[in-house]
Amino acid sequence: MTTNSVTSGRRGEPLVLRDLSKRFGAREVLRNTQLRVEPGQFIAIVGRSGCGKSTLLRLVAGLETASAGSITVNDKLLTGLSDDTRIMFQDARLLPWKRIIDNVALGLPKDRRAEALKVLDQVGLADRANDWPARLSGGQRQRVSLARALVHKPRLLLLDEPLGALDALTRIEMHRLIEDLWRASGFTALLVTHDVQEAVALADRVILIEDGRIALDETVSLARPRSQGDAAFAALEKRILDRVLQKPAAPERESFTHPNDGEPRWPGVPAHGVRWAV
């Protein structure tokens, strides 16, 4: 296996953030953020609650508007939602009144329904196509959410703590599934996670956000597939975790908070958009 993803020839989109800032009221959550992501790279974003991780992801998704700076996707200025971008959240957000196949096919023309079944097969749930969401486990629901995103063949996949509510064994299974599908499809991926081990397991680069700025950009030069029991893996995980913990926790704030990341929310700012897996 190669040490990192081969970005040349991948169908993922390049992403560039220039002087990106975001304010909620008087609080600046992101400030002058600079980031370049090559096509097909897998980027993990870590940091303490409230540091700006999920806000950055929502800006890239087009669910929030930047206070300053710009986002360029595939050399085009981002001005809103994109058909080439999909986002997954910790909550699978399946429609309980629709069967699994219909959740995956949501937004597809009728003549592409067969594609939904094919993607369900890729995530190991073809035999549950006609079940209701309530009959699935948490891990299975997230597999459906992943299938619903991938059926649209995104060039940029955003993952906002999608595995945070799953048990340890299910998380490991999902790591393997996400990595396999990423390697097969070649999309660019941005993962927000509190789990440094998860970041090292999946990413080409681990980005630490601290006080609204990128404080660390660590290349993960470990061969794939990665073993969490490997000494080099453990050493890199410890180094990044030590750096995350080096910064004392921020004092509590009096404000509305974002449910995913503890980031400030304010009246009139939409909490979600329509492109979460549609």
Swiss-Prot record:
Pfam families on file: ABC_tran
Main location: membrane
Membrane topology label: Peripheral membrane protein
Subcellular location: Cell inner membrane
SMART domains attached to this UniProt entry: AAA
This enzyme's EC code(s): 7.6.2.14
Molecular functions (GO terms): ATP binding; ATP hydrolysis activity
Ranges of biased composition (kind: Basic and acidic residues): 251-264
Keywords on record: ATP-binding, Cell inner membrane, Cell membrane, Membrane, Nucleotide-binding, Translocase, Transport
Span of domain ABC transporter: 15-236
Leading EC class: translocase
SUPFAM superfamilies: P-loop containing nucleoside triphosphate hydrolases
GO cellular component: plasma membrane
Family, as annotated: Belongs to the ABC transporter superfamily. Aliphatic sulfonates importer (TC 3.A.1.17.2) family.
Function field: Part of the ABC transporter complex SsuABC involved in aliphatic sulfonates import. Responsible for energy coupling to the transport system.
Complex formation: The complex is composed of two ATP-binding proteins (SsuB), two transmembrane proteins (SsuC) and a solute-binding protein (SsuA).
This protein's name: Aliphatic sulfonates import ATP-binding protein SsuB
